[in-house]
Each structure stands twice: as structure tokens, then as C-alpha cells.
Amino acid sequence: MTREEIIQAIKEMSVLDLNELVKACEEEFGVSAAAAVVAGGAVAGGAAAEEKTEFDVVLASAGDNKIKVIKVVREITGLGLKEAKEIVDGAPKTLKEGVSKDEAEDMKAKLAEVGATAEVK
């Protein structure tokens, strides 16, 4: 069987069949195809958005009280004063990536308390 024949056979498979094929390949070769599974879920539609478990916290704007915002950014990120100030001055900037929904919402609330605008993506 040639590479082209294999690709053609894969093109003709349903999403369910492709999922089973990926699992079989993972077991056979002892590898993980996590990125391929995520890509397959995105093709399926809105289900991927509902299953999202990691979120990014983005500082959209610092508001009027930059000093307090810088302090909160330092607390959230663990960065030094200079780095935190650069993030606040350069908003919109991503503060944290790949955090849980609860953690992301807590960060957003802390930023809102000091007048900043943050987004959870």
C-alpha cells in the first residue's frame, strides 16, 4: 500500500473511525497524539469549547491606578517590578497561560478590584 493510498483511505474515514485509528496507533507505537485529538475535536464543532480546561488571563487595560495594578500583576505572575510594569504599560498582554477556570476567574477578580480590565480566554 502506498502513502497516497493510505492518505486516501484516511480521508474517507468518519471522525469516529479516525478517533479509533488514533487510539490504536497510540497503543501500537506507545506514543501520545494529544494535539491530533484536539484538532479532531475542533472539527466536531462546539464540543471542544465546552471541554476547555485551560485558560489564559489577559490584561486588557490597566485603568487609572497603575501602581495597584502593577502590585497585583507581580502577585499573580511572580515577576519583578520592572517586568510587571512593562506588562501593565504594554496592555493588552497575557499574564498567565494554561490555568484552571477557577484560578483564571480569581485573577480576573483581583485585577478588577484595583480598576484593571482583564479577560479570560
Swiss-Prot record:
Single GO MF annotation: structural constituent of ribosome
This protein's GO CC annotations: cytosolic large ribosomal subunit
GO process annotations (BP): translation
Keyword flag Lipid metabolism: no
Cited Gene3D superfamilies: 3.30.1390.10, Single helix bin
Pfam families: Ribosomal_L12, Ribosomal_L12_N
Alphabetical UniProt keywords: Ribonucleoprotein, Ribosomal protein
InterPro entries tied to this protein: Ribosomal_bL12, Ribosomal_bL12_C, Ribosomal_bL12_C/ClpS-like, Ribosomal_bL12_oligo, Ribosomal_bL12_oligo_N_sf
Keyword Cell inner membrane among UniProt keywords: no
Domain of life the protein comes from: Bacteria
NCBIfam families in UniProt: L12 (TIGR00855)
Oligomeric and partner information: Homodimer. Part of the ribosomal stalk of the 50S ribosomal subunit. Forms a multimeric L10(L12)X complex, where L10 forms an elongated spine to which 2 to 4 L12 dimers bind in a sequential fashion. Binds GTP-bound translation factors.
Family classification: Belongs to the bacterial ribosomal protein bL12 family.
Described purpose of this protein according to its UniProt entry: Forms part of the ribosomal stalk which helps the ribosome interact with GTP-bound translation factors. Is thus essential for accurate translation.
Name of the protein described by the UniProt record: Large ribosomal subunit protein bL12
Species: Clostridium beijerinckii (strain ATCC 51743 / NCIMB 8052)
Gene behind the chain: rplL
